[in-house]
């Protein structure tokens, strides 16, 4: 495999050839009978088979009976030296040994070849292109000795077929020889290597030598005695037992043919593609080309037989199933035999040997450049050119159970053989290739985060090793051989065992020291006090007047120090409390300081902190920053993550009753999963961040946390009261359930007077500490909040009406039009469903139904339609670029994840750099996005967040602008979202823009939200109000519906342009804080948002206008009456249509066919807006020239896909409105362009001056003129130089083509009604809506047979021909055919006309024919 520097690798081979050769010979051929004579370094021995050979002295012990014969030989030498002869007893003993070896030698060899069965990876049937190694590379490769462990492996273990026993780390060269130079010269002269003389003996089996000794299917060896004979493949090194092969299942003829012509294994018989993989691509050699024998082997006559066998038999890897020619593995004639034996023994290729583990992840890829471009193309390659790019790649992968430190580059073919599914999935993602200028793996993935356990040289781990003190164990860091660690930026379940880093790698070594010391801190942690802590000193002696010295993460503000002392006092008096500071004042820092004081002074731990999932990482970071001496653990994520924390950090192995941590941070979503663990321990302090989650005493979180044992409870919330006072009482009940009952307090304070108000404040005061930014921060940046009212686009209006009109029965129940038997809960659920659909429509119509989007439009027009579909996107396309140009950084909050998806597409279209996270984002993704946005000189200008997930507990003070896309029912959610930017650390004025749609449910939502804000600070009002009641939902739905269904509204649509948006931003930047009035501060009220009226910012709060002239109960009646009126019209049209179908009246038609209907009913309008009623004007592009012209005498084509149902008078339209109908309706209101004509049209040129004569108003607007010849085809819409952006109803392509041609050739084509040049069917004076006929392309009245196309027999015959080729259902075609036949059977009456008119018409026809002929000639 090519290395990372794209150089060819050297082929290496093991240095013990006998170890890999001996198992392939019979016992008689490898059992030494006696030693004949001895030289300096070799012995001449005789085997039981009668063969004599020279063997090195140090290799004699590898042969059977070699040591025994050596002892006999040494004994014989000693006797010969002293006595000069050998006794008869010695000869008898030698003969006895020979007999024993002959009888038992084969049995011993069979016992030594027993194997374990194992399974390999998936098969991949593709040929491997071999690596081409030159003779110089092979001969110059250096040799290296075998490892000592391999020499100590006994014969039985060495022959076991198991990947664990293969020498994967063998680094010796395959192409090298371990002979000296003198020995090489002698072997070249002899043409044979002395220890390979067996290969050239008579009757040597080369087939057996080139095949593996293990069955591919059952992994068993050959046993002839039991009938398990091998069947050898003729094309590769695979072998099968006869019963395991497919031969028994074949018929007799096929089986005989295979036995005569050779057996081909299933892998070779398949038509596998000869892919252009890495090695062949780089070297220019492929197995698909004509076979080229390396010259070093072709010139050797002694190897001719071996080379001939190697031409047809290739090595096939057991694991990846690739094949490769043996002589491409090693072209050195002195070592090729050793290389063949090495691979046959090992069973796997080089890449499988180096990387035995499965693939976990594919990270990147890169393309290899061929060293021989002329040879890189394959003549016999079955792979298409488009697939070559995938097979000429290298992939950067990570193995299972390995860290990112051990990633490696691998070939495409090897990866396909090991993990084909992963490769296909990765290739389908269309990832960009590897960029050498950027790191493939983030640095954080290779830095140690936590050390869970270690293993010392003694074999013991950190918990079983015995050390006297923590210092002794800390010094033993040099004894650590492996460590079980997690990595920064990765989840805990990706932890693995790794050797400690080297000291030269400073960053990794520093992290390793920190992780090891934290592990020891956890192991040597002191036991938590079990008894309650009693303090005899008065609190005045304990109070902090300055910041404690052990709090070193930063400087506490004066109000934060007061908050620390207040929490300390609550704990001192054993009184639970609520820290209710406004968002952005640093409640987290105050709580961490409080925990530090308890631990430093009183050794008070453990502490349990419950936080939202989005803020877990932030809490862990702040705890490590402000209290580094605390042992902190986080219980979050999947079960694998939490199990690691439980097993290695929380539960003390020596004393399971005590927890081995000071602070445990757990997400609120995991409390239920880990409740059994939390109940085991007595927690000194229980802290709940975002304590408003406990507002419902029936929630599971309230129930489970109430069962956790704790000495002191503390809640953190910036919004203690959100909807009603009962929620506030529930918080107090959670803190002190023994003294406070929420239900009783609610009954007690249901009726409020002055005395009870004072009493209620006395109850709440000991629990709360509430401060706002304006009270404690002097130079805090101001905040300007502005509501931007918008008008719905036509698409939104249509969908809005449709949603309300579809729920007739429900609306009748609400307004009292019909009796109802359904319960109130069912009605409330239905109302909520309607409300959600309306809110989706107001956010973006694509959220309501994705089918509204036309996916066949060009990209530019598709994005234009996306903007024009929603009024909020229309203002964003003006507002966001201007804010970015002014240097603002923006946070965009939405409650719909689908809207964030749409915004992502829009930002990509606008090339705006952004970050995003929502509820589905992982913890690492969230923190990474926050860090990237807050980084100095960050290129990100926008941040997309969901209101619920991104509105709590995160710091985004680097942003100075907040845009709320859709208001929340709970105003505190929006306030928390705003507080992400308007918080401590902000240095700029914060601009807040809230987008709301006028005359819609959003107005009522904002109004109700303002009431809740008032309730938050004026508890005495509306205590018994239920804001989720059916009445409130009805009022929200009712709001705006009256104005929407009014036939003529007095108020115009709100319009915004670049000037008005520029003025909006400028005025907002000049305004002061919306809540800086002293009266608001003293009364502790929230300031209301100000409303932009397109001229200035109103100082009044947002007031919702209600029409007091109409009774509230009559709103739905107006809607119902309108819907019933429409239904009656539909019914009347249907009855009339049926009546016309039954009455077959004969209608008079003229002979001539006029393609233009020039009557006064034709209406054309100028569409100079984005869409009808849109407040955002867009410039209309005019057509300046035509690049292509008319074809040569082309006839009008009729689309065969036209729905023939429209010919029938029986109409099935106007059925129940569903989502599909709404999608079609909305599509017709979006920006659309005519689609390409499905017929091939040949265009020719035409003189414009001649065309002007043809298209003059003299001929076009004459109602008496009728065409006699075939209609002329006009060029399609796409050929016009400047694309005219159409917004409006979708029109017929023929109508648009005719209109654009005539309007571009002549300036006199104007409407006869209004005198304006406009699109067909868009006349502003039109009262009766006309429809465009799909047959003739002209507008005319429907309901009668008025189409000019039906007046001409030739046109009717064309329609019948087109109908016969149509794919419409047979019954529809039958009806349409009968209809057309009825037109043909009607009597024709001559047209009565005066002679003057006849002469005038004939003269016009003659002039027109001459003009057309002249145009054709040109």
Curated annotation (Swiss-Prot):
PANTHER family: CHROMODOMAIN-HELICASE-DNA-BINDING PROTEIN 3-RELATED, CHROMODOMAIN-HELICASE-DNA-BINDING PROTEIN 3-RELATED-RELATED. One of its GO terms (cellular component) is rDNA heterochromatin. SMART domains: DEXDc (SM00487), HELICc (SM00490), PHD (SM00249). Required for proper positioning of nucleosomes at heterochromatic loci and for transcriptional gene silencing (TGS) function of the Snf2/Hdac-containing repressor complex (SHREC). Its main location: nucleus. CDD domains: DEXHc_Snf (cd17919), PHD_SF (cd15489), SF2_C_SNF (cd18793). A zinc finger (PHD-type) spans 212-271. It comes from Schizosaccharomyces pombe (strain 972 / ATCC 24843). One of its GO terms (molecular function) is DNA binding. One of its GO terms (biological process) is subtelomeric heterochromatin formation. Pfam families: Chromo_MIT1, Helicase_C, SNF2-rel_dom, zf-CCCH_6, zf-CCCH_7. Gene3D superfamilies: P-loop containing nucleotide triphosphate hydrolases, Tandem AAA-ATPase domain, Zinc/RING finger domain, C3HC4 (zinc finger). Residues 568-738 form the Helicase ATP-binding domain. Changing residue 587 to A: Weak silencing defect. Interacts with clr3. This is Chromatin remodeling factor mit1. Residues 135-156 are annotated as: Disordered. Its EC number is 3.6.4.-. The keyword ATP-binding applies. ATP binds at residues 581-588. Residues 875-1034 form the Helicase C-terminal domain. Keywords: ATP-binding, Centromere, Chromosome, Helicase, Hydrolase, Metal-binding, Nucleotide-binding, Nucleus, Telomere, Zinc, Zinc-finger. It is found in: Nucleus; Chromosome, Centromere; Chromosome, Telomere. Residues 135-148 have a biased composition (Low complexity). The gene is mit1. Transmembrane segments: none annotated. Belongs to the SNF2/RAD54 helicase family.
């Amino acid at each position: 495999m090519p290395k990372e520097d794209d150089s060819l690798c050297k082929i290496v081979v093991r240095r013990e050839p006998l170890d890999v050769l001996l198992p392939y010979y019979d016992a008689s051929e490898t059992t030494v009978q006696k030693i004949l004579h001895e030289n300096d370094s070799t012995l001449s021995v005789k085997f039981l088979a009668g063969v004599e050979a020279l063997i090195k002295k140090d290799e004699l012990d590898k042969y059977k009976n070699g040591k025994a014969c050596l002892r006999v030989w040494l004994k014989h030498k000693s006797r010969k030296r002293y006595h000069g002869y050998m006794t008869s007893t010695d000869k008898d003993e030698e003969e006895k040994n020979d007999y024993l070896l002959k009888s038992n030698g084969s049995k011993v060899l069979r016992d030594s070849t027993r194997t374990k069965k194992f399974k390999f990876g998936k098969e991949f049937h593709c040929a491997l292109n071999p690596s081409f190694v030159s003779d110089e590379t092979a001969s110059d490769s250096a040799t290296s000795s075998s490892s000592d462990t391999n020499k100590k492996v006994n014969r039985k273990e060495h022959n076991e077929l198991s990947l664990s026993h293969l020498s994967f780390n063998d680094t010796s060269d395959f192409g090298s020889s371990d002979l000296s130079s003198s020995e090489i010269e002698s072997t070249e002269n002899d043409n044979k290597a002395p220890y390979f003389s067996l290969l050239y003996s008579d009757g040597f089996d080369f087939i057996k030598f080139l095949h593996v000794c293990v069955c591919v299917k059952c992994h068993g060896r050959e046993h002839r005695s039991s009938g398990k004979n091998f069947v050898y493949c003729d094309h590769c090194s695979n072998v099968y037992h006869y019963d395991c092969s497919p031969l028994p299942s074949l018929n007799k003829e096929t089986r005989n043919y295979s036995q005569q012509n050779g057996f081909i294994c299933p892998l070779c018989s398949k038509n596998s593609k000869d892919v252009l993989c890495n090695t062949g691509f780089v070297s220019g050699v492929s197995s698909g080309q004509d076979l080229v024998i390396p010259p070093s082997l072709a010139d050797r006559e002694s190897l001719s037989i071996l080379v001939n066998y190697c031409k047809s038999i290739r090595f096939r890897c057991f694991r990846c199933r690739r094949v490769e020619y043996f002589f491409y593995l090693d072209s050195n004639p002195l070592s090729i035999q050793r290389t063949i034996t090495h691979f046959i023994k090992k069973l796997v290729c080089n890449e499988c040997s180096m990387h035995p583990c499965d693939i976990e992840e594919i990270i990147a890829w890169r393309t290899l450049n061929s060293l021989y471009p002329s040879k890189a193309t394959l003549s016999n390659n079955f792979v298409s050119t488009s697939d070559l790019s995938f097979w000429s790649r290298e992939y950067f992968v990570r193995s299972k159970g390995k860290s990112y430190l051990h990633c490696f580059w691998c070939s495409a073919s090897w990866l396909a053989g090991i993990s084909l599914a992963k490769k296909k999935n990765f290739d389908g993602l269309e990832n960009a290739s590897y960029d050498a200028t950027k790191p493939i793996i983030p640095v954080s993935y290779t830095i140690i985060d936590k050390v869970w356990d270690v293993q010392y040289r003694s074999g013991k781990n950190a918990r079983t090793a015995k050390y006297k003190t923590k210092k002794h164990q800390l010094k033993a860091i040099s004894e650590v051989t492996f460590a079980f660690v997690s990595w920064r930026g990765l989840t805990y379940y990706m932890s693995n065992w790794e050797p400690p880093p080297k000291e030269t790698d400073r960053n990794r070594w520093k992290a390793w020291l920190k992780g090891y010391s934290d592990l020891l801190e956890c192991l040597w942690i002191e036991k938590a006090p079990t008894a309650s802590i009693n303090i005899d000193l008065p609190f005045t002696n304990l109070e902090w007047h300055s910041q404690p010295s052990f709090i070193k993460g930063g400087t506490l503000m004066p109000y934060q120090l007061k908050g620390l002392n207040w929490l300390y006092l609550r704990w001192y008096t054993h009184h639970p409390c609520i820290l209710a500071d406004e968002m952005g004042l640093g409640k987290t820092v105050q709580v961490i300081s409080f925990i530090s004081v308890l631990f430093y002074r009183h050794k008070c731990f453990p502490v349990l902190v419950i936080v939202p999932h989005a803020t877990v990482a932030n809490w862990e970071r702040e705890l490590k920053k402000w209290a580094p001496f605390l042992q902190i653990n986080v219980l979050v994520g999947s079960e694998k993550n939490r199990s690691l924390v439980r097993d290695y950090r929380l539960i003390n192995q020596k004393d399971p009753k005590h927890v081995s941590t000071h602070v445990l941070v757990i997400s609120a979503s995991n409390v239920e999963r880990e409740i059994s663990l939390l109940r085991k321990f007595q927690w000194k302090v229980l802290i709940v961040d975002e304590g408003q989650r406990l507002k419902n005493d029936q929630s599971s979180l309230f129930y489970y946390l109430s069962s956790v044992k704790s000495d002191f409870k503390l809640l953190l919330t910036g919004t203690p009261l959100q909807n009603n006072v009962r929620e506030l009482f529930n918080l107090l009940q959670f803190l002190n359930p023994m003294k406070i009952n929420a239900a009783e307090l609610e009954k007690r304070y249901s009726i409020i007077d002055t005395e009870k108000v004072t009493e209620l404040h006395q109850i709440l005061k000991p629990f709360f500490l509430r401060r706002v930014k304006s009270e404690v921060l002097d130079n805090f940046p101001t905040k300007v909040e502005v509501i931007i009212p918008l008008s719905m686009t036509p698409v939104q209006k249509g969908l809005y009406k449709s949603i309300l009109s579809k729920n007739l029965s429900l609306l009748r129940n609400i307004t009292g039009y019909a009796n109802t038997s359904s319960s109130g809960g069912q009605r409330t659920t239905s109302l909520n469903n309607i409300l959600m659909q309306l809110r989706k429509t107001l956010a973006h119509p694509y959220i309501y139904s994705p089918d509204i989007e036309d996916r066949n439009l060009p990209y530019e027009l598709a994005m234009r339609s996306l903007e024009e579909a929603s009024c909020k996107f229309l203002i964003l396309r003006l507002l966001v670029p201007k804010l970015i140009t002014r240097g603002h950084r923006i946070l965009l909050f939405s409650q719909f994840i689908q809207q964030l998806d749409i915004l992502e597409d829009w930002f990509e279209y606008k090339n705006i750099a952004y970050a995003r996270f929502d509820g589905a984002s992982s913890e690492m993704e969230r923190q990474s996005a926050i860090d990237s946005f807050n980084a100095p000189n960050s290129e990100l200008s926008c941040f997309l967040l969901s209101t619920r997930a991104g509105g709590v507990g995160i710091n985004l003070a680097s942003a100075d602008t907040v845009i709320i896309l859709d208001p929340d029912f709970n105003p505190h959610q929006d306030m928390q979202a705003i507080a992400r930017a308007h918080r401590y650390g902000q240095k700029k004025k914060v601009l807040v823009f809230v987008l709301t749609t006028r005359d819609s449910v959003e107005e009522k939502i904002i109004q109700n939200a303002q009431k809740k804000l008032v309730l938050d600070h004026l508890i005495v009002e509306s205590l018994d109000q239920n804001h989720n009641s059916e009445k409130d939902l009805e009022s929200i739905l009712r709001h705006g519906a009256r104005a929407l269904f009014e036939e003529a509204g007095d108020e115009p649509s709100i319009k915004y342009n670049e000037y008005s948006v520029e003025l909006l931003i400028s005025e907002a930047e000049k305004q002061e804080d919306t809540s800086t009035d002293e009266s608001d501060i003293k009364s502790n009220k929230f300031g209301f948002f100000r409303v932009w009226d397109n001229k200035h910012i109103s100082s009044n709060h947002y007031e919702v206008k209600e029409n007091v002239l109409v009774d509230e109960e009559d709103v739905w009646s107006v809607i119902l009456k309108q819907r019933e009126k429409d239904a009656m019209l539909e019914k009347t049209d249907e009855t009339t249509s049926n009546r016309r179908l039954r009455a077959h009246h004969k209608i008079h038609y003229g002979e001539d066919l006029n393609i233009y209907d020039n009557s006064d009913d034709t209406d054309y309008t100028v569409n100079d807006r984005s869409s009808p009623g849109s407040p955002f004007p867009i410039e209309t592009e005019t057509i300046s020239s035509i690049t292509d012209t008319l074809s040569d005498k082309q006839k009008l084509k009729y689309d065969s896909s036209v729905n023939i149902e429209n010919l029938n008078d029986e109409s099935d339209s106007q059925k129940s409105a569903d989502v599909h109908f709404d999608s079609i309706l909305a599509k017709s209101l979006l920006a659309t362009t005519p689609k390409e004509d499905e017929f091939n049209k040949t265009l020719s040129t035409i003189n414009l001056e001649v065309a002007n004569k043809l298209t003059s108003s003299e001929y076009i607007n004459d109602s008496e003129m009728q065409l006699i010849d075939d209609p002329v085809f006009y060029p399609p819409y796409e050929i016009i130089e400047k694309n005219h952006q159409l917004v409006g109803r979708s029109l017929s392509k023929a109508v648009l083509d005719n209109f654009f041609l005539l309007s571009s050739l002549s300036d006199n084509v104007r409407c006869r009604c209004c005198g304006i040049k406009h699109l067909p069917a868009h006349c502003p004076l039109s009262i009766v809506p006309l429809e465009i006929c799909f047959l003739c392309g002209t507008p005319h009245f429907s309901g009668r047979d008025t189409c000019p196309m039906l007046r001409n027999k030739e046109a009717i015959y064309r329609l019948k021909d087109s109908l016969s080729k149509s794919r419409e259902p047979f019954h529809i075609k039958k009806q349409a055919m009968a209809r057309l036949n009825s037109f043909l059977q009607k009597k024709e009456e001559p047209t009565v006309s005066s002679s003057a008119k006849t002469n005038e018409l004939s003269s016009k026809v003659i002039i027109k024919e001459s003009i057309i002929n002249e145009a054709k000639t040109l």
